[in-house]
UniProtKB/Swiss-Prot annotation:
It is found in: Cell membrane. This is Proton-coupled antiporter flippase LtaA. GO terms for cellular component: plasma membrane. CDD domains: MFS_MdtG_SLC18_like. One of its GO terms (biological process) is lipoteichoic acid biosynthetic process. GO terms for molecular function: antiporter activity. Belongs to the major facilitator superfamily. LtaA family. The chain crosses the membrane at residues 15-34, 46-73, 80-99, 105-126, 138-159, 165-184, 211-231, 243-263, 275-294, 300-320, 340-363, 369-389. It comes from Staphylococcus epidermidis (strain ATCC 35984 / DSM 28319 / BCRC 17069 / CCUG 31568 / BM 3577 / RP62A). The gene is ltaA. Proton-coupled antiporter flippase that catalyzes the translocation, from the inner to the outer leaflet of the cell membrane, of the lipid-linked disaccharide (anchor-LLD) that anchors lipoteichoic acids (LTA) to the cell membrane. Pfam families: MFS_1.
Amino acid sequence: MQDSSSSNYSSNRNFVMMLVILFLMEFARGMYILSYINFLPTVTSIAIAITSFAFSIHFIADAATNFVIGFLLKKFGSKLVLTSGFLLAFISLFLVIWFPASPFIIIFSAIMLGIAVSPIWVIMLSSVDERNRGKQMGYVYFSWLLGLLVGMVIMNLLIKFHPTRFAFLMALVVLIAWVLYYFVNINLTNYNTKPVKAQLKQIVDVTQRHLILFPGILLQGAAIAALVPILPKYATQVVKVSTVEYTVAIIIGGIGCAFSMLFLSKIIDNNSKGFMYGVIFSGFILYTILIFGLSTITNIYIVWAIGLFIGLMYGILLPAWNTFMAGHINPNEQEETWGVFNSVQGFGSMIGPLVGGLITQFTNNLNNTFYFSAMIFLALAVFYGYYFIKTNRRVKP
């Protein structure tokens, strides 16, 4: 009994420490990717094309690394892979201190940071306790979201004092996360050293066995990300509000999401699989209605209310969807499978802004992008609603 309690304490301690490390790495990413490089064209001579490329290449590096990181963790072990990741992130952001507006360093650092964060995410997802997956995934996504947003906001404020003087803080945050890592005990599932050919075959096998999940993984990210390029223009030209009021809408949505992730996500663990299916289906339907509603509304107070509901729904839909995915994963292939899933999700997040921007540009109508995003969620609701009904019929005697 004592051994069991000690094991649970150690497991919980490791989980909390990994949450802190994830928060710090996302904090550094928020500072650099969401704030620092976006402000560079306004305070230095660096071109917008350079910073835009750095932004895109960061997520390409992240997605590409996710595809193979699970296999690298199994082959070389978590210590070597994570230490290499922290080293790459620290060196790249340390170089920014000395070359704050160098195009090469800006792009190089964006790539290295994308690579470095990948193994932390895969280990984090693999270490979640299956008995409390909904609740713990709420904590994971809360740490991710909080890290990104707080890092971005703090860097935005610091840039107002001086555009580059506080760049050292990004490397410092990574260094703190690196030190904390040595106080964590990480256990991988089914550690092995398969040859490259066998690993490639396993990637194909993992992909083929989870094809039913790919539409949801890819298209959810694409549908949400498609709105990113048009939301500022929608706020200022359609709703006709200031950037401050637009920021308030984002904050309200973030608060709703945080509340849902921390307090509502745990209900996924305490209810049946049918309840989880209902949350996912309802989430897709509500997203369809709410996103479509944004295309017809010009009252900022209603927009704030919709933002709150979207945040609340996102905070419970994400853990529910994650629990649904986890039910399809072989326990001995968690790192490999989560890596492939994260990679597919990353590609969805990359193509979303591109498609959303092109739709708006060629149709010259912001509403068409809202329609596109809403239709994706409607298609997901129909697809997975049908799948859930079939699954429930199959398990009934």
